Amino acid sequence: MFYQDPFDVIIIGGGHAGTEAAMTAARMGQQTLLLTHNIDTLGQMSCNPAIGGIGKGHLVKEVDALGGLMAKAIDQAGIQFRILNASKGPAVRATRAQADRVLYRQAVRTALENQPNLMIFQQAVEDLIVENDRVVGAVTQMGLKFRAKAVVLTVGTFLDGKIHIGLDNYSGGRAGDPPSIPLSRRLRELPLRVSRLKTGTPPRIDARTIDFSVLAQQHGDNPMPVFSFMGNASQHPQQVPCYITHTNEKTHDVIRNNLDRSPMYAGVIEGIGPRYCPSIEDKVMRFADRNQHQIFLEPEGLTSNEIYPNGISTSLPFDVQMQIVRSMQGMENAKIVRPGYAIEYDFFDPRDLKPTLESKFIHGLFFAGQINGTTGYEEAAAQGLLAGLNAARLSADKEGWAPARSQAYLGVLVDDLCTLGTKEPYRMFTSRAEYRLMLREDNADLRLTEMGRELGLVDDERWARFNEKLENIERERQRLKSTWVTPSAESADEVNAHLTTPLSREASGEDLLRRPEMTYAQLTSLAAFAPALEDEQAAEQVEIQVKYEGYIARQQDEIEKQLRNENTLLPATLDYRQVSGLSNEVIAKLNDHKPASIGQASRISGVTPAAISILLVWLKKQGMLRRSA
């Protein structure tokens, strides 16, 4: 039977991608249905209890700048906040927070249940309704059919998921949850390339059985950072420390002596695991010269005794896991409350997607999260927001939108996936971005909030706060530009006390702030340049914009040159065999990838600059050279 009301957008899956997709589509005024196998696990942190980190924190800030949910949720649930790379330049600084799993899930569910235009329904999905290469709905486990103009798949590790502990394995979407086997079979019937990936998680430890007195503590930062541009530290719950222990030679001997019982090394697992989050058995074998590995003992929440030992993800048998855990300092009497495991699951080649995350082959079908080959809550949330946005726009008969590589880490993520694909779980790093000086955490709102407003994602409150911040930045920069001090002025002595070389000529506030030794806080503590801005976000922008002005201008020039290629469009139906002068290898790769632009084509492995030149000349001769606005 069909449900009585049709929807504009259906989201299948209630993890980090699905919840962002649902919130986004509903926020844009589209009637949205979120289908989940269990309402109680909406926003569940399946693996580590943390949000953010290098590259990942940048994505969270971008999601927030576009009106998304993740930053607000972690501000309400974070039990330890830190700035990573704090001593380095602003481009690579990143926020990270330990999370209370229960509080995080509560924050997400509360937001979903209070979002207008959004209905949540608990039922596993087993089939899609596809008519003439267009998705028009979904079918649940009990045969109930829902109609919609667009469907977003955010199914995580559930597609034909298989859990491995030692040489034993069983079907599961994650520990304690069933897999989605009928939907996996249905998707394999569609003209989509599918493969398998693997990820893993460590055993969870009972905190009452750990001797914390012999371990080093790691505290959060003070003052506490916040994730959301709309947030403040008063929203944070109680803050707690993490603890540090290490593996040792005894640990490594246990692992080496039991490799024959590892499903990875015994050849039972076929899926490829994450390169940058390897299992402890992988670390011991790949880095044989290391006699120890640092392990962070992270609390799972304020009301839980569970500890997440970050760094010992494993699929070894339970008895071996016990030996590994008890070989480490402070853990000699530790008890495991949940065994670690590896999970294999289906993912679909993201090269079969448009940059909007819509399938190239099934109109109206969008993919986001681990189904696209990524790993991590933050990568999933960013894709979920983009897929939800474009599903909503499609249902409203509007053109899709995707950010450029020069505009956002989300743009880098999507371009990497859609252009290059992935053979292993993809995670974000700052090193993946060519323009990382422009793509900082601190300016995510300056880069994206105006566009978010145009797209209908940014509410009036955020928009007013954003414009106030812009005005504060502009007013303060003008004030510093027009405030001068001369070497002979009474205030010069106070200024010189903060400089490595004294003033030799008249200088403005901006001139002084450009000096490496002068901070904004120091400058505005001087009588001549007081008072400081009360808006801390605006003050940070003033300092960064002034100090890095030359570098930022140079990078902006590079971006403008590159945009010429990015905006030169390639016809979706072009058969590259028609283009004389291209090698067979280049023709095969271009026909396989079907790049949307010259810029995207230039990033495909094996497509040379010479091939790009040939292609541009051919397009011009054919009168097919056109650029997007």
Swiss-Prot record:
Cysteine disulfide links: none
GO cellular component: cytosol
An individual GO BP term: tRNA wobble uridine modification
Keyword Flavoprotein in annotation: yes
Task of the protein: NAD-binding protein involved in the addition of a carboxymethylaminomethyl (cmnm) group at the wobble position (U34) of certain tRNAs, forming tRNA-cmnm(5)s(2)U34.
NCBIfam families: mnmG_gidA (TIGR00136)
Subunit structure: Homodimer. Heterotetramer of two MnmE and two MnmG subunits.
Protein name per UniProt: tRNA uridine 5-carboxymethylaminomethyl modification enzyme MnmG
Organism of provenance: Salmonella paratyphi C (strain RKS4594)
Upper taxonomic lineage: Bacteria, Pseudomonadati, Pseudomonadota, Gammaproteobacteria, Enterobacterales
Gene for this chain: mnmG
